[in-house]
Amino acid sequence: MIIGLSDAFALGGIALSFLVAYQFIYFYFIYSPRAKKLGCAPPVIVFSFPLGLPALYKFATAMLHDNLLEYISIRIADMKVRTGFQTLAGQRWLVTLEPENIKTVLATSFKDYSLGFRYDIMYGLLGNGIFTLSGDGWKHSRALLRPQFSREQVSHLESMRTHINLMINNHFKGGQVVDAQALYHNLTIDTATEFLFGESTNTLDPDLAQQGLPGPKGLVTGEQFAEAFTSALEILSVRVIVGAAWFLIWTPKFWRSCKVCHNFIDYFVYKALATPMEKDQEADRYVFIRELTKETSDPRVIRDQALNILLAGRDTTAGLLSFITYYLGAYPEVYAELREAVLSEFGSTDVETPTFEQLKQCKVLQNVIREVLRLHPNVPLNFRQAIVDTKLPTGGGPNGDQPVFVPKGQNVFYSTYSMQRRTDIWGPDATTFRPDRWNEPREALASGWDYIPFNGGPRICLGQQFALTEASYTIVRICQEFSRIEVLHPDVITSKNSMKQRMRLTQTASGGVITRFIR
């Protein structure tokens, strides 16, 4: 039977009417009574076009134009409250910016939540690792990895020093215009692979980057691995955005990229398993993957964990360094103050490598890093899925001060980016880069739940000290070598504090950070 266009529209209208009716019935006759029984009150409910399709279109458009984080902040602000329901692509999300609610999800009621569909989204590349697993699998991964990120291990700066100096001498010192963000991605993958595998991808050295390694499935170069890793992460980020419909995002290029990454990592895995480290080598040099072989001989476990750590070790630190450079160029007075402090505390040359403790004690440096992480947290958007009926402490009722019922299966979304820019917490200049705010009494809140650039609770980032150490040392070396940073990014000219940001799994500066380092 063939139906006419008018009949098709009529059927579509009927289907949409049923969807609207279902939303109404669910919230007022199913959700609300269950919430009341638990002493909870419903939060604000933002009803949108059925399935939230217009919102999805705006969401996708904002992402394509590198304006997603600002769009989400505006959309949340339009709710007029800080906890409420919104619908996107047929998925009902409980959105919150309340520190107490986020604390409950990540810490107080940690056992009530899982990563939801994140495991399925990322499994193709990352496998069973610390960033994909929940429950007992996650506990085992964390127990396996925690010793590898002890203070003693992350405070070894000599291997970082080699790659940082290579970047400065080969790419920064000539006074040429460079994309600092691209070079920071090279730096962090080189230092991360050195830490993980004992051998670097050497992407900052074109000659070494072209040398192939004999993986189980053929030769692969460090440059090929870096490109494949970036390509695979691009696809994963789109999958995260579309959520439960992630399975629609499938491309042959993704699987080819995964195979290149796995082949590259497997070279180091099988090498580590075949050649145990000698006692004198153990004392001389720390290598993550070799230490892991002392805990397990399963090559798949080692590969998955190494890839998970590599994800965190590269993109988050590169993003942090990129935004630091942007702001230091946009605010020359801040750079002048920072450089004066660095030269006073560390000297003007790289004769001696600073210690982990010295870097942490440089207050001006740490204030700059804290402020950048406030404005640009490593993972600005995140979510958890309830695995049991549970509740949040605040956000319900007409005044938003009553508990909120979270039914099993409900996704709870939180934006660290938006929360860390709230004017009621950080003042009227919350969106402005001002490092000296960390000299004020409210600095104590840095240990609270309104400032969680590395997440919080049991799943707090294991590698945060590694990232902070690398970022700190890199900025110290830049200050020692250059009197001024000239950022040619167009946003510096129009508005220093409203730069476009490209949101994928982590955030980066849209268009790179086009820079000239001046001696």
Swiss-Prot record:
Gene that produces this protein: CYP52E1
Residues annotated as transmembrane: 10-30, 44-64
Listed name of the protein: Cytochrome P450 52E1
Cofactor list: heme
Main location (coarse class): membrane
Localization per record: Membrane
Positions that bind heme: C479
PANTHER family, A to Z: P450, PUTATIVE (EUROFUNG)-RELATED
Cellular component terms (Gene Ontology): membrane
Gene Ontology MF term list: heme binding; iron ion binding; oxidoreductase activity, acting on paired donors, with incorporation or reduction of molecular oxygen, reduced flavin or flavoprotein as one donor, and incorporation of one atom of oxygen
Keywords, comma-separated and alphabetical: Heme, Iron, Membrane, Metal-binding, Monooxygenase, Oxidoreductase, Transmembrane, Transmembrane helix
InterPro entries: Cyt_P450 (IPR001128), Cyt_P450_CS (IPR017972), Cyt_P450_E_CYP52_ascomycetes (IPR002974), Cyt_P450_E_CYP52_fungi (IPR047146), Cyt_P450_E_grp-II (IPR002402), Cyt_P450_sf (IPR036396)
The protein's Enzyme Commission number: 1.14.14.-
Membrane protein topology class: Multi-pass membrane protein
Function, as annotated: Together with an NADPH cytochrome P450 the enzyme system catalyzes the terminal hydroxylation as the first step in the assimilation of alkanes and fatty acids.
Organism: Candida apicola
Keyword flag Transmembrane: yes
